[in-house]
Amino acid sequence: MGVLARIQTPDDLRQLNSAEMKQLAAEIREFLVQKVAATGGHLGPNLGVVELTLALHRIFDSPADPIIFDTGHQAYVHKILTGRKDDFDSLRKQGGLSGYPCRAESDHDWVESSHASASLSYADGLAKAFELTGQDRHVVAVVGDGALTGGMCWEALNNIAAGKDRSVVIVVNDNGRSYAPTIGGLADHLAALRLQPGYERILDSGRRMVKKLPWVGRTAYSVLHGMKAGLKDAVAPQVMFTDLGIKYLGPVDGHDEAALESALRRAKAFGGPVIVHAVTRKGMGYAPAENHVADQMHSTGVIDPITGRGTGSASADWTSVFSAELIDQASHRQDIVAITAAMAGPTGLAAFGEKYPDRMFDVGIAEQHAVTSAAGLALGGLHPVVAVYSTFLNRAFDQLLMDVALLKLPVTLVLDRAGITGNDGASHNGMWDMSLLGIVPGMKVAAPRDTATLREELDEALAVDDGPTALRFPKGTVGDDVPAVSRLDGVVDILRAPSGRNDVLIVSVGAFAGLALAAAERLEQQGISATVVDPRWVLPVPESLVKLAEDYTMVVTVEDSGLHGGVGSTVSAALRAAGVDVPCRDLGVPQQFLDHASRAQIHAELGLTAQDVARQITGWFAGLGNLRPEQQNGVVADLDAQRAEKQQG
């Protein structure tokens, strides 16, 4: 029996000797590779925190001592050690193990962290609560993967430092590759110099001496200066944290479990706020991840566990289409610049940065700063494009409203992963954006349905110079283009226009065009005539769409976003404002936190399939009392089928 098979709770870890701990770390890495390869997930970050998580659970008494993982995708090892290893075959699947900490799964999961930079604020609040209620507990926050670039961390640190007697242990999981050169005698010598008061003076003296030498000396200085710059981040935390009044321990080798235990034991005994700086390597122990240049296999789909290569299709996705089009636009518009918040690869801006390095700005995990910095770029005469995941726009709403929209600045937001994203759970669904954007004065929002309209609408957004614009598109592959039959007033695309009766006008939003067309075909079989339109620009509601609605018995909107404040509600409001007395119904995502599952499974649960949409519209249409004799049989039969299904369910 292997060591991992004997681990059911953190208490079991404390019975192991040094050799068994090393064996356990190796077994956990093998387990992670095999399981994540089959389900997809965050592989690289978890391979990098194996020893760190083992040490945390050996030194601290979870769940009495909360261990809070910032950007909780690095909590897989924590889950393995807290009784959930047998559930990993269901990782990120419907009804299975969440890819993030989950309070419903275990008492060891205090929060459901997945958005970065929040762990220190949680820790600050918990420590204050324990102090006020007389509980002698330690609070641990594990923060890494760039989360310290988020301003919220520094707001929290400012407050944590004031609690001199509160035991808050902040573990900085530093897996940046800038520490790769810090090995050998030179690294040891520079580390010793850093601890001396005259470190900077000695470096300055050395710089002057070396630069006086022939050109070789200048080259040598450049190399040494580069090494210093690469290592500077190892010095800065100590200075910054100790100046705040927080004790600093480290850097510690994040893959030396014994050294980590020693540092954590000292931190625990200190009795006040402490930083433990652990230097780790993302993807540690798995060659395909260690050698993955882009991000050490930060997040993967299903892969071959031997080669690390993906097994999915290579079809074009929304992100790559946007990336190519933005590069093309920038080739003939020098005013276009791009901004991302530590998501250059996932949002498609990495290629833009390679092509136009001086026009690309990665600001770290700082969405608030990204948007207001974009405002500054716009004030300077440029047209910034801010590409973020839809769910992360929530963090920058005030900046969008007050720093961009109030000034009527031409800033374009590109919201990737809009709508239901699925496997990453409630925190990553991009279902809130329309509700937020809809209340911003002067905001214009486009929802492309395919490759052609994405390119077209990005071009149109970049032409707007009197206010903010946004494009939203979903996760995944694009699919075939959905051609329009005609375009109304140069704005609204007519995708389906049956001759004769005008029963139902279906307003499809973005990539739901295919769904709307399939539902319309089903309605036709019931004798209900359905026209399908794509407004393209969903905010503000096009006047031509409002005028078109006058001719129909009923209007139905179908969208992959929240119903409250979504496209449906804005269309209804526009119809009322124009005095158009036509019933308007909306189909979309209810305003609730949705459990993780595939996008298709969630859409099915929400009734956002062609069959369900057609049935819902059939019921509404019948309820209006407008059925003609020739429609009765088909509609009645369909309603009977719905009742039978409900009874069986």
Curated annotation (Swiss-Prot):
This is 1-deoxy-D-xylulose-5-phosphate synthase. The keyword Transferase applies. Its EC number is 2.2.1.7. Belongs to the transketolase family. DXPS subfamily. Thiamine diphosphate binds at residues 73, 114-116, 146-147, 175, 286, 367. Homodimer. GO terms for cellular component: cytosol. It comes from Rhodococcus jostii (strain RHA1). GO terms for biological process: 1-deoxy-D-xylulose 5-phosphate biosynthetic process; isopentenyl diphosphate biosynthetic process, methylerythritol 4-phosphate pathway; terpenoid biosynthetic process; thiamine biosynthetic process.
